[in-house]
Curated annotation (Swiss-Prot):
GO cellular component: cytosol; protein-containing complex
Taxonomic lineage from the root: Bacteria, Pseudomonadati, Pseudomonadota, Gammaproteobacteria, Enterobacterales
Annotated positions binding Mn(2+) 1: 9, 11, 37, 129
Assembly description: Homotetramer.
Native organism: Escherichia coli (strain K12)
UniProt keyword annotations, A-Z: Hydrolase, Manganese, Metal-binding
Phenotype upon changing residue 74 to N: Increases specific activity with bis-pNPP and pNPP
Cofactor(s) the record lists: Mn(2+)
Listed NCBIfam families: PRK09453.1, yfcE
Protein family according to the UniProt entry: Belongs to the metallophosphoesterase superfamily. YfcE family.
Cysteine disulfide links: none
Protein name as it appears in the record: Phosphodiesterase YfcE
Amino acid sequence: MMKLMFASDIHGSLPATERVLELFAQSGAQWLVILGDVLNHGPRNALPEGYAPAKVAERLNEVAHKVIAVRGNCDSEVDQMLLHFPITAPWQQVLLEKQRLFLTHGHLFGPENLPALNQNDVLVYGHTHLPVAEQRGEIFHFNPGSVSIPKGGNPASYGMLDNDVLSVIALNDQSIIAQVAINP
């Protein structure tokens, strides 16, 4: 079974990036899935702790060969010039044995504007900075929250897919925030 780690809404935070890369190295995950808003903090957000987008790009480039990424609403062509993995696709798909993960940032496709999905597929998105791991109707919804600018009183968080279970995990203490089994 494929093991994936998900990080969203880094927004140029070097401490968050360092922690994500530390956990990725320890996790045994094959891929680090970045769900957009990689380098820029955006006009609606305050600067995250340790805002250093060029350093974040350098650190992420060290694992570029293990990154799958999608473009967020704060990502631009200029950001792509610093990164050694593609970030300009509005969505990607990861095919599992019996279902697919539809990866998107959440500003184009999301819970209120679903792409065409089949029963048991998983909508994986960021953008809201709010953790979600649940089944809604025939599909699963998964948002790992934000590693740098958490909202809704939640801690900074990331996601894991391991043994057909999607988990949102607190970045600081590894506690489980939300979890859903996706085996059809």
